[in-house]
Amino acid sequence: MAQNGIGTIHKLDMYSTVTNARFNITQLISEISYYESLESPTASMTISILDATDFKHSVPILGNEQLLYSFSDTFDDNVRLFGGMRLYKLANAMRIKRDTDSYDLFFTREHMVQDQYAVVEETMGPMLASDMVENIVRGIMKSTKMLRCEKTEGLTVTTFPRVSPFTAIDMIASEAKSARANSASAYVFYETNKAFVFSTLDALFEQKPVRTFYYLENQVKSDNAIESSRILSLEQPRAFDMMGGVASGQWGVKISSIDTISKTFASTTHLYGKSFNDTGHADGTTPLVSDQTQKELATKITREKLLVTSAGRATNAYVLSKTPDAAHQYRRRTEFAGREIVSLSSLMSSAIKIAVYGNSSLKAGDMIEIFIPATGIRKPGDVKNKLLSGKYLILAICHRFRGDGTYITTIECAKDSFSTKLSGGDF
């Protein structure tokens, strides 16, 4: 029977590197924490163990053990989290009572372990940056996992100086310009249980929400379906950070570039309001700051960045007469760096964390909608908190399964716009 907050562990088998024997460790767990994040190229897992059988020494656990897992919530439409990982660290071991030890096992994907050994030392191109990512995932990492790759604009040539595959992808992400119109081209590369994803934040924000969650008072009774959408706890670690925005370039950034071949110098200025209006958003067209704040803070440059580029030669007649390919094979970062810096700084200035009943279908990169009721003095018809309610992008997610069967999902998420206007009496 489906129950909110209850999970099912279908498989949790670890294989010894000494005897190749298989051990089901379900009865030993205190807690399983499965993590995904837009800031990490791989998923990971931590398992807290309560060991009263000296399992650690009898196996023995020496590192690099393989773990095969499968778990989910208990609803009929559940999506299983499943796959394999490698044990890379045992830590926090202590004797908690006679003949009983506790310790934590840290697992990561096989490709993360291999990433420390694999080397990318070649020149790729001319080709799309998105195709380079696919070449690395398929050709160097030898991964057959699904890959979702947002297409990039323009052919480019990149030389990788003996770096790991994930470092190479980071290099590509920092230079890739999205083929989408008016994109800030802030690319991220991350892993979910199902796929690798190479995408811009713009594209992620423009997805439709997969689920709506409600911050209901505890005394409100509801049926099982509504209860599954209840927010159990809500925390706002940062609502805004004005001084941090000044330092990071949220309000205004100047991008200067020099092309040493064509001997040209150029500069562009990007202010918060213009960059906001130039890109797409999840919830509407209202920035997260007031017009007055923009007038006071977003009219001057607070950060400057100098880039060495090859963009100047793309329009230089002499260079083009000698190397025609320069017209479309050049470094494009100067074309989007300002919008990217402003967008990323704005995104990281605020975030909220919520806990909900375990939901194995949620993953990093999903959009969700959050409804928070209005409190205090309010206008007739106001039913929701207009500042906090809205559409959010999941930046990081943790699925927590406890030994007693309890299953909770914790989410860190952020929004990039308001759905209602700050002026005109909406607030």
Predicted regions and their residues:
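Juxtamembrane "anchor/assembly" segments of surface/extracellular structural proteins
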Residues: M1-Q66, S70, L105-M112, R148, ...
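A broad structural signal for short, well-ordered beta-strand segments within beta-sheet-rich domains
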Residues: T26-Y35, L87-A91, G154-T156, K221, ...
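Surface-exposed cap/loop segments at beta↔alpha junctions
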Residues: D54-L147, V157-T158, A173
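Short, cationic low-complexity segments
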Residues: L68-D73, A129-I136, Q219-I231, F240, ...
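Residues that flank catalytic or metal-binding motifs in active/ligand-binding sites
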Residues: G83, Y103, S185, T192-K194, ...
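Short beta-strand-centered interaction patches in the first periplasmic/extracellular domains
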Residues: S102-L105, R109-H111, R148-M243
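Short, charged, solvent-exposed linker or helix-capping segments at domain edges/interfaces
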Residues: Q116-V120, P209-T212, L422-D426
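Extended, domain-scale alpha-helical bundle/helix-rich regions
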Residues: T200-E206, Y215-S345
